[in-house]
Amino acid sequence: DLSDTRDASFSPDGRTIAFSSGNNLYLYDIVGDSVRPITTDGAWNRIINGTTDWVYEEECAFTKAYAFSPDGQKIAYLRFDESRVPVFEMMRYDGKLYNEAYSFKYPKAGDANSVVDLYVYDLKTGETERVDVGPDRGQYILQPEWTPDGRLCFQRMNRRQNHFEAVLCNP
């Protein structure tokens, strides 16, 4: 079921569309009219691939958490492990006779945030490689992008948000 599709983006050559759905990242081949998953471990309130969790969406101001390389052969993407983040529950008031509770991961001050990893997926080989983002598992990993010459750039910032680095690497 791909009904909750979001954050769609064309590849540089315009032949492929990447998108997130069901907490997984997918590729749609326009010419072949076929969809293939890049990730399969996405699960509600546990793992998010290719799009951000609540903290990143609200506090870091972005949702699309992947980027095509300039040659369109690779995709860098963020993977959010929310398993340690506490669940927050609120009532949905949507006009029904009985309201339903909506549960989602929502860290309050001092609670655990998602553990974020950066991966690079090779469209030709289908292989995925984890990028070393440093030893601080509680840091923010922001805005994965590619330079015109094919190097991967991302930003990292500690949770106190008083130390920021731009990192350039060759995955």
Each language-model region and where it sits:
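Asp-box/WD-like beta-propeller blade repeats and closely related beta-sheet repeat scaffolds
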Residues: 1-65
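Beta-rich catalytic cores
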Residues: 4-6, 62-64, 114, 140-142, ...
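Structural WD40 beta-propeller signal
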Residues: 11-13, 69, 147
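Hydrophobic beta-strand positions that form the internal "hydrophobic ladder"
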Residues: 14-18, 72-75, 150-154
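Structural motif
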Residues: 22-28, 84-91, 115-117, 161-168
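Short loop/turn segments that connect beta-strands within beta-propeller blades
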Residues: 30-33, 122-126, 170-171
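Predominantly five- to eight-bladed beta-propeller fold
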Residues: 38-66, 77-130
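Long hydrophobic segments that form regular secondary structure
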Residues: 122-158
